[in-house]
């Protein structure tokens, strides 16, 4: 018994010798004498590190399961947030090759000017407009059925100032442009009145040749866009042709020359002959 107590004291002394500031450990000590022999492996405790031990030749890790669950939950939340942030917007779904979004007033003007004789449909929409969202799949179908027609999308929320200068105050709103005619029609419609859109495509969609240059936006609209200080757009108004003044009539117009009057002798002769 005395031997066991002394060995226990040695065991505790060994523990004291291996104590450090950031951990504590127990050195392996063997007990014997009573037919019982066990070995205690070194046990270490460190801040924010899992506990490790050796049990029958296998390594056992003691960790905080709550921390692990928290890390997994945080990773799942971050992945979910990333997926939501990169979700495709409704006005970007189903787009065709002849559909694109306008990013500036200059791009809108250039797109209409360079369209030539092609029919151009300008679609004014807003992300928060329920009617615009419901109508979008139909517009994509029309674009697919009419590959020769150019569809331009204008986001009202991103280009409010430009839409105000163009006089757009209702959504969804559409403008049709064609060659030298410029704007051929404009209207607002929903799924209930989609016939307006279908009829406009049928009327202005067939191929035709313009006799003049492509018009695009009207002169007053271009001037309004240039006057808008919030837009990075410049435009030089076309010179107004001066009408030629009408020729003023002469103050002394030429009058016909009167016939010479007959002399008194001739009159007497005629009277005498009559007698």
From Swiss-Prot:
Localization terms from the record: Plastid, Chloroplast
Residues covered by region (Disordered): 238-275
Biased composition (Low complexity): 249-264
Signal peptide bounds: none
GO cellular component: chloroplast; chloroplast membrane; chloroplast stroma
PROSITE patterns membership: THIOREDOXIN_2
Domain of life: Eukaryota
Residue positions of the active site: 129, 132
Matching InterPro entries: Thioredoxin-like_sf (IPR036249), Thioredoxin_domain (IPR013766)
SUPFAM superfamilies given in the database record: Thioredoxin-like
Disulphide bridges: 129-132
Broad class of the protein's primary localization: plastid
Keywords associated with the record: Chloroplast, Disulfide bond, Electron transport, Plastid, Redox-active center, Transit peptide, Transport
Molecular function as annotated in GO: oxidoreductase activity, acting on a sulfur group of donors, disulfide as acceptor
Domain Thioredoxin: 73-206
Pfam families the record matches: Thioredoxin
Feature: transit peptide: 1-72
Described purpose of this protein according to its UniProt entry: Thiol-disulfide oxidoreductase that may participate in various redox reactions. Possesses insulin disulfide bonds reducing activity.
Membership in a protein family: Belongs to the thioredoxin family.
Protein name per its UniProtKB record: Thioredoxin-like 1-1, chloroplastic
């Amino acid at each position: 018994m005395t031997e066991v107590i002394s060995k226990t004291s040695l065991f505790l002394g060994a523990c004291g010798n291996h104590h450090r500031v950031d951990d504590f450990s127990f050195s392996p000590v063997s007990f014997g004498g009573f037919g019982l022999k066990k070995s205690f492996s070194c046990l270490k405790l460190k801040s924010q590190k899992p506990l490790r031990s050796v049990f029958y030749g296998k390594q056992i890790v003691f960790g905080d399961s709550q921390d692990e669950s928290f890390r997994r939950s945080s990773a799942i939340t971050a992945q979910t947030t990333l997926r939501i942030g990169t979700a495709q917007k409704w006005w970007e779904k189903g787009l065709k090759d002849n559909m694109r979004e306008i990013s500036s007033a200059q791009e809108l003007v250039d797109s209409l000017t360079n369209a030539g004789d092609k029919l151009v449909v300008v679609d004014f929409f807003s992300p928060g407009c329920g009617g615009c969202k419901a109508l979008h799949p139909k517009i994509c179908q029309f674009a697919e059925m009419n590959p020769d027609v150019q569809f331009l999308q204008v986001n009202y929320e991103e280009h409010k100032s430009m839409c105000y200068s163009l006089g757009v105050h209702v959504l969804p709103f559409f403008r049709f442009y064609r060659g030298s005619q410029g704007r051929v029609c404009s209207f607002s419609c929903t799924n209930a009145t989609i016939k307006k859109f279908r009829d406009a495509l049928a009327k202005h969609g067939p191929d035709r040749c313009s006799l003049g240059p492509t018009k695009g936006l009207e002169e007053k609209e271009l001037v309004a866009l240039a006057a808008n200080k919030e837009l990075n757009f410049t435009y030089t108004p076309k010179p107004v042709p001066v009408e030629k003044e009408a020729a003023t009539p002469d103050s002394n117009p030429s009058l016909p020359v009167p016939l010479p009057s007959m002399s008194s002798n001739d009159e007497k002769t005629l009277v005498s002959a009559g007698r």
